[in-house]
A protein has these predicted regions:
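AAA+ P-loop NTPase catalytic core and its hallmark functional loops
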Residues: 2-201
């Protein structure tokens, strides 16, 4: 899989899924997803058991284009839950772990040297964030509260439903795809901790 390619799907979801049958929870709701599966759609775990309250919250994010954050202890399956919902809706899903090694450049992109017609040229190579925004992708930020401050400022721009991403180096403003969705998982709910692990939440 490569982020240089565009995901070939309809601009908007084109199939309805019965929540009760699809996720085996008590609900009379139906949600929209995609009819066809692409390479970016997670594999379905047939044995996965869905928590009703969490599932409905995630589905609200998909169906109504709402930003959803899931909080829980480490290793409780927060990101997996989002992935398994996306898998059943045939919704492409990308996870980015916001550990201390992820930088602003990693998200937005950088200049790269490429060979074209036998000559070396410098060309801007988009990162995962601009690519995701321009495609029907459910983007999941893992360990949201561990993100570096410079990274969090970049993410802040797209928290609004119609939030546009500005690439200053490229003089470019990117509008989100109609089926772009944003999720996050977190451990501390903004409280930080005494170990210094969650850099973006240390109170000064």
């Amino acid at each position: 899989m490569t982020i240089n390619s565009k995901i070939e799907l309809p601009n908007k979801p084109n199939q309805k899924f019965d929540v009760s049958k699809t996720f085996k929870i008590d609900s009379k709701l139906s949600v929209k997803g995609f009819k066809d599966k692409t390479e970016w759609v997670p594999e379905i775990d047939e044995g996965y058991i869905f928590d009703k309250e969490t599932t409905l919250s995630i589905l609200a994010g998909f169906d109504h284009n709402r930003r959803v954050m899931i909080q829980g202890f480490h290793g409780t399956g927060k990101s997996t839950h989002i992935e398994q919902v996306a898998a059943r809706l045939n919704w492409p899903c990308v996870r980015i772990n916001l550990d201390s090694h992820i930088s602003r450049i990693d998200l937005l992109g950088k200049d790269a040297i490429k060979v074209r017609d036998g000559k070396q040229i410098t060309e801007f190579q988009e990162g995962l964030l601009p690519w995701s925004i321009q495609n029907p992708v459910a983007l999941v930020f893992d360990e949201y509260d561990a993100g570096r401050p410079d990274v969090m400022f970049v993410i802040q721009r797209i928290l609004e439903v119609e939030g546009k991403l500005t690439l200053l180096d490229q003089n470019k403003v990117i509008s989100p795809h109609a089926s772009f969705r944003l999720f996050a998982t977190t451990n501390t709910v903004g409280l930080g901790d005494v170990t210094g692990l969650y850099l973006s939440l240390i109170h000064i």
